[in-house]
Amino acid sequence: MGTTWSVKLMVSPRTDLHPLHAAVQSQLDRVVAQMSTWEADSDISRFNRLSAGSWKILPPEFFSVLSCAIEIAKASDGAYDPTVGPLVDAWGFGASAGARQVPDTQALSDA
């Protein structure tokens, strides 16, 4: 998702950190596989390509995040909008973005 991670902890100098690193990386890989708009085959990318009214079984974690996003959108009266991806792309930001420029009226309407 275009970022890095690090963990700081205090352990004995003899502690083998490889299992911890592998466990953290495994969980992060799972999040990316489900929720990265930068990955064409992620669950969210496939979900976003569905036509309106289509059904898809979602992993429990993805469903939980999606449900929370919808609740925040409702609670904020739309100030937070989880469907803003096409608009972000139109302005030239995001995973599928083109050149950063002010989009024309049609591009904004399409988004």
Walk through the language-model features, giving the residues of each.
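A contiguous, well-ordered beta/alpha segment that forms the leading edge of an enzyme domain
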Residues: 1-111
